[in-house]
């Protein structure tokens, strides 16, 4: 509540304020957490052609914390099969460094011919530049970057054209359980009757949308977004998909996933 009041006070000190982002959704959530429930809200459609984005949810794997070790190899296999359909540059996003490293080790054994670069904790400016240079240079033609969802490489980077042709998002981005989050959930449950949504689901989906938005950066870009988690088939998650995601396809079969991606590749 204190954070909400601080934002509201700062906004009310100005004659007017404009907040904009491609991921301010759902509107009700952001209007309430900024203390501006009665503000005007405008939602514009995506300017990019829907057929330029291949969007697939592989909902046959659980990436919940308790299941990660036992599904790590299966997750790595799905990433490898998806990245093998078309040579190019991809980023795979994970909810934590530990999980990312676990799957990356398995991936390297499954797909040794695909180059791998991994985000490190506390990277310097020069290290970040070297990481991004892998995608903008022609030296590596087939590479998968392993990154943390919600981190420095899941928002605020612009890799257009062939610099990035796919984002593979492992998990739903939900924040880890903590005392702070539970207090937030309790507060929003008492005030909005949406404690779990405001404390966990909406912030998580925001990170997913940010990462997915790295792929299509101009009207000429074509690429794929792969969501990996069985929870993407839940109604509460589907309600949060933006309008330009209505063409999403679901599969639990690795062979079917390859066919979907191959068909998209042939449409070029």
Indicate where each model-derived feature is located.
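ASCE RecA-like P-loop NTPase motor cores
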Residues: 1-4, 8-268
